[in-house]
């Protein structure tokens, strides 16, 4: 068994909360494999390429990756080439604003925001 029933249900709950973000992202795809479970696949659409795949270990793992991607979108938007923990106050405010709808639905994962902002994985 790849995940317990409870683990898979929780991963699917996180997936549903981030469904629109997952659907719209040009940088990754979340796929199901009967062999290994959920796989986070780094991709590109212009040019088209497939890069690395990482197995999603838990709902917290998926939430971390999604929140990190939301924050990365803000950093790309501002054109600044630096790590999340070095975001300026305006970037930080926008990141937190974009995280809010997700964390409101997944409050048990709010600690992940602090982990991301401090550079912890």
Predicted regions and their residues:
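Negatively charged, low-complexity tracts enriched in Asp/Glu with abundant Ser/Thr
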Residues: 1-29
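Intrinsically disordered, low-complexity regions enriched in serine, threonine, proline
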Residues: 5, 20, 93-95, 117
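Acidic, low-complexity, intrinsically disordered interaction modules
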Residues: 32-106
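Short acidic DE-rich linear segments
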Residues: 119-121
């Amino acid at each position: 068994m790849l995940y317990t029933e409870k683990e898979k249900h929780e991963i699917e709950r996180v997936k549903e909360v981030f469904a629109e973000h997952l659907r719209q992202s040009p940088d990754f795809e979340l796929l199901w494999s009967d062999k290994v479970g959920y796989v986070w696949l780094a991709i590109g659409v212009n040019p088209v390429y497939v890069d690395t795949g990482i197995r999603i270990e838990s709902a917290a793992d998926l939430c971390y990756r999604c929140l990190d991607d939301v924050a990365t979108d803000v950093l790309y938007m501002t054109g600044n080439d630096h790590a999340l923990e070095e975001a300026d106050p305006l970037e930080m405010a926008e990141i937190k604003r974009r995280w809010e709808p997700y964390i409101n639905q997944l409050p048990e994962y709010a600690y992940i925001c602090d982990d991301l902002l401090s550079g912890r994985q």
